[in-house]
Amino acid sequence: AQVARRMKVRPNIGIRIKLASSGSGKWAESGGDMSKFGLTASEVLAALEKLEKAGLQDCLRLIHFHIGSQITKIRRIQTALNEAAEFYANLRKMGYNVDFVDCGGGLGVDYDGTRSSNSESSINYSIQEYVNDCVDTFVETADKYGIPHPNLITESGRNLSAHHSVLVIDVLETASLPEMPEEFEAKESDHKLVKDLYEIWDNLNPRTMLEDWHDAEQIREEALELFSHGLVDLKTRAEIESMYWSVCHEVNTLAKQMKHVPDELRNIDKLLADKYFCNFSLFQSLPDSWAIDQLFPIIPIQRLNERPTRKCTIQDITCDSDGKIANFVTYNHVSHVLPVHSLRSKEPYYLGVFLVGAYQEILGDLHNLFGDTNAVHISVKDGKYRIDQVFEGETVEEVLDYVQYDPKKLVRHLEQWVTKSVRTGKISLEEGKNFLSNYRNGLYGYTYLE
């Protein structure tokens, strides 16, 4: 009111209402009685009294509410809309010319494709149903009380922005569990545990598969215990380890042929998964995957005419053990492994991570000093794409500057060390030049592997 008088204007005023209704999913607490923002019913009345005292009652034009992000259940939205519509109707009946209602955000994204409220990464409604409910609720309430229909506004940031961005990551290297060569045969001189495990592996069959699995686990545990006490040598441990994983692979293959798979065999895929090390930082590019276990659709974006033959989890290149993805969207459930192709020598292999446009780039941090990635803006028209702009990612020099390291001073110090080392004969002049060149290339280059 003071600013309006000083500026000699009649302001347009809006009030955010704290509804008792709340959303569903990860952000349910953004709404309801314990939410951070908004005025309760009694606080709204107090605010109206202040407006009247200031002579600004005709300036109240909008009410706003927000019950959370990624609302999974349409019923929660309907309940909130009914409550908000009554607030609107009551204000109109009290003589306030409110003509705008901001329904806030919350329109979710079906990340996992299940169209189900059972998953926090999905929603059980369509955009059309959401719009229909918003409009129908306020129209019906307004008609019931004989008041004007309001202008409706929504702030569906996640649903609007999630689809606009794709993260493309290249696979650098893979790691697989050791397996025993098919031609291996246990010898009489081998340790008893090796011979026992070989017999299990050699005679594995569907009828005794579960018992064989239990016996293989017991032998492995016994071998590890004996090794820790110096009673089994490294060669024996390695043979048992490799043979155990070979047994696991065959048990997994047999289990997939069963109509009813025992519970303890359902997650062998996860145990056997390859590790695909990819050129990215989870904390910079997909922070919600780490922080709140958000699911994003991930698929290979090449060799799509080939059936994937491997299953993997994704590892980033940070030194943090949390830098991995081990939950993936599949046709009808969440899987712990991603079907992928085996790598070919000297041929790049790329994975696409989709629906990352909502907040991932903004939330990303400099964990391990991995900076912003290269980015490309692409537009599509009439079925054809056009590269509009290319943005280079951050360099090592730039991220070091963020943490108060002066790159120029670092180079000077290294130059002084190289000069001194050449002078004292520790390194040759050629070695000094190469060392400085490599250092500068690293310092002024991309924070990811090139």
Please give the residue ranges for each predicted region.
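Charged (often Lys/Glu-rich) extended helix/loop segments that serve as interaction or gating elements
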Residues: Y125, D133, V139-E450
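Active-site cleft segment of glycoside hydrolase catalytic domains centered on the general acid/base Glu
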Residues: S116-S119
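Active-site-proximal beta-alpha core segment in soluble small-molecule metabolic enzymes
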Residues: A1-D102, L107-G113, N124-E129, T137, ...
